[in-house]
């Protein structure tokens, strides 16, 4: 398994466990997989487009982006819970959004775990924003989507 370092990998594995507990049964497994996939794509895109200097070489083997994908999975699952009336999920989405916004403004993650801090900041931002944008776009295109979400 390729990853930044052991502590970063361990943080991601702990995040998987916490996210699983928080969003368990919030949406069908395929929907959760879509959230993770879109979050990872958003994370990778943000890493390449927003890093300093922009790293537009998409040929490199990706070894990062899981933490951004996990942010996307968390936000997507929480939005699914919010659509079902869980108010705490709304507050957690706001908290995650404020966290990634703060990280982007500061240029460093709130919890440092390796040598790729700028990459992690962009990954967290990209993973979160792509889900928020996808959900918003879906509601704009199909206002009748109601509780289904992605």
Residue ranges and their predicted role:
Residues 7, 85-92, 113, 117-120:
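Membrane-interface helix-boundary signature
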Residues 12-17, 70-79, 124-139:
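Hydrophobic cores of alpha-helical transmembrane segments in multi-pass inner/ER membrane proteins
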């Amino acid at each position: 398994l390729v990853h930044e370092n052991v502590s970063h990998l361990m943080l991601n594995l702990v995040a998987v466990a916490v996210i699983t507990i928080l969003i368990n049964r919030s949406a069908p497994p395929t929907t959760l997989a879509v959230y993770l996939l879109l979050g990872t794509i958003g994370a990778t895109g943000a890493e390449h487009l927003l890093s300093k200097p922009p790293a537009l070489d998409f040929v490199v083997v990706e070894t990062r982006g899981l933490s951004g994908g996990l942010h996307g999975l968390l936000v997507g699952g929480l939005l699914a819970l919010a659509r079902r009336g869980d108010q705490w999920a709304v507050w957690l989405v706001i908290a995650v959004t404020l966290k990634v916004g703060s990280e982007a403004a500061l240029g460093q993650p709130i919890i440092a775990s390796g040598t790729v801090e700028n990459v992690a900041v962009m990954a967290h931002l990209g993973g979160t924003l792509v889900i928020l944008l996808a959900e918003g776009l879906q509601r704009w295109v199909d206002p009748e989507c109601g509780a289904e979400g992605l």
